[in-house]
Amino acid sequence: MKIYVDADACPVKDVIIFEATNAEIPVTLVTSFSHYSNAEQPKGVETIYVDSGADAADYRIMQLAKKEDLIVTQDYGLASLALAKGCIVLHHKGYKYTNDNIEQLLQTRYLSAMVRKSGKRTKGPKPFTAEDKEKFRALFKSMIAL
């Protein structure tokens, strides 16, 4: 198993790196050049930089990921593609994407886009909380222990 992180706006990178390095599982952070950092990463953690274009990180993750790799993303489109490839996919708020829930998530995203396109406003996501982080940590640890 390898772990790939859609890292541009991922609030749980520290959890992923800590837990994965303790379990000696390699982590690849995929992020755009606009988030460049020369901070040193722990052994087993690699950062891949991609252009800032729409979905560039998603495309790179899909090139790299293999069946049964673990992907962390908040992007429903990437989650859908990764599920079809046989990957394990987690959201940073502590839930697992599945073939059972991805259709509903994609449909909700589409309907919200249509509402916004018509000039109306939609609610954004709820703020990320410490409880969300701990929920993610518990789920992540259970997934890498398999």
From Swiss-Prot:
InterPro entries per UniProt: UPF0178
Recorded coiled-coil stretches: none
Pfam families xref list: DUF188
PANTHER family in the cross-refs: UPF0178 PROTEIN YAII (PTHR35146:SF1)
Family to which the UniProt record says this protein belongs: Belongs to the UPF0178 family.
Name used for this protein in its record: UPF0178 protein BC_3040
Organism: Bacillus cereus (strain ATCC 14579 / DSM 31 / CCUG 7414 / JCM 2152 / NBRC 15305 / NCIMB 9373 / NCTC 2599 / NRRL B-3711)
